Amino acid sequence: MNILTTEDARFIDREVPKQLGISLEILMENAGRGIVDALWGEYDLFSLNNGRSINSFVLFICGTGNNGADGLVAARHLMEQGVPAQIVLVGDINKCSDLFAVQIERCKAMGCSIDMYDEFNDWSNVAIAVEGIMGTGFTGRLREVTIDILNDIDTMRSQYNFDLWAIDVPAGLDATTGHVAEGTLTYDYTVTFGAIKQGLLLYPGKAVGGTAVVAPLGAPWQQVLGERVRTITIDSDLAEKIINYRTPMAHKGVNGNTLIIGGSNDMIGAPILAAEAAVHSGAGKVTLAVPKIIKQIVQSRVIPEVMVTSTETNKELFDCRQVVAMGPGLGRTREICDLVDHILEAYEGALVLDADALYALGHVGCVNKDALRDGDIESAYTVERELPYCVMTPHLGEFSRLIDLPIKWIERHYITLAREFAKAHQVILVLKGIPSIVALPDGTVYVNTIGNAGMGTGGMGDVLTGVIAGFISQGYSLQDSAVLGVYVHSRSADILNETKSWGYTPSDVSTSLGCVISELLGDYE
């Protein structure tokens, strides 16, 4: 599913009327109907008074721009259907948008109940409140008067226990970055138009938007955007398109030969987790190369399906490998940095770089903060070290070191920086965070939509590295392996989360990978 930014939404509003001859007024009418359909999808609107006052109604809290006008259209359609609805207005009606002026007159002609917010006091009869104070164009800070109104709505919600909906995005949420202004409320639902807005998938925005319901725009906006939309959700639909059913004649040679390089005296478990995950994701053969000093103890702990060798056997280390994954628990000595450099030069096959292998790279690029702040993306990132085509799987701290930028800056420009890094270096970047994202060399970014808080424990990233390597060994492209790996890894954790909120281990996630693969293949068949 596509993901839209603020700029994408503006582009649609501007270009759909130009290119397709579908006016903004028609798009607004469709949006209003979409709100109504979303409400019907969650409630029996003819039974609003069940457990409530006999005079219960749906309240639309509308600003005087086009976001509020969407709410006016929805209120009008509900009234036409016989569902009680009332409208309260926020802002100066004398400064309203042209389409708002059209819609408010239509509501008046239908006899809709319309009050200014300060005059409204019938909160005890509100069954559902729908907020349309401002839309996707918001950025920065909320005005004090808006904060006061939102605080008042929240107080009334606590007192009278009604659900709160947002139109397109909650007031105070930046639709692109996911950052929320002071005073932003937490909503039960957000009905958003055409496609989900990026800010609803990025924290803290994801925490305030509630359940997102995507309402169709009633226009083929995708053909207008064309290649402009490069941000896509990672979900079951996408994973089902990627995964392939195995031929009955498949054998271990067909399913690939994976090499995991990692481990040190202090980090024995990390490479074991990666190697076992490669096995559980379906790799035909998995070899784990560790320093000779820990080889014996690793052999005693790893599952028997994993072959163990020494990193000192350089000559045969890369023979017949479909993929080499390097980094889990590897260590940060000068010798390790030399080893990583040697492998980058000597090995020409598929590579997955994680953890200490990323540390060994040092700074590979730098960010111009002023350009980034000003939105001059083309000038924001400069390459300092060339990299081979590979999959890189840093968490935020590791990514911070790679691009020499504080984490707070990365969080603020999460998707932009990932996209520019992958484009500049021509690599596949799996940036592990909340949410994890996969950025491709062509500028496409995939945003993970699943996973849970139980994944916040040491070793989860090692498992992901093994999963991605395992899929590469089976013949999936690096791109598909990264996307599929992120999905399968998170979905495995979600299955465990059904019985354990947290406390499950990375090893549990690894051993549950087959359940997810079966789930996907069941749909595939």
Which residue stretches match the model-derived regions?
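N-terminal small/polar loop signature for handling phosphorylated ligands or for N-terminal nucleophile
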Residues: 73-156, 296-309, 315-316
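Internal gly/pro-rich beta-alpha loop/helix module
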Residues: 127-128, 133-229
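Small-residue (G/A/S/T)-rich helix-start motifs and N-terminal tracts that mark the onset
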Residues: 1-90, 97, 189, 200-355, ...
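Short strand->helix junction
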Residues: 93, 135-140, 174, 180, ...
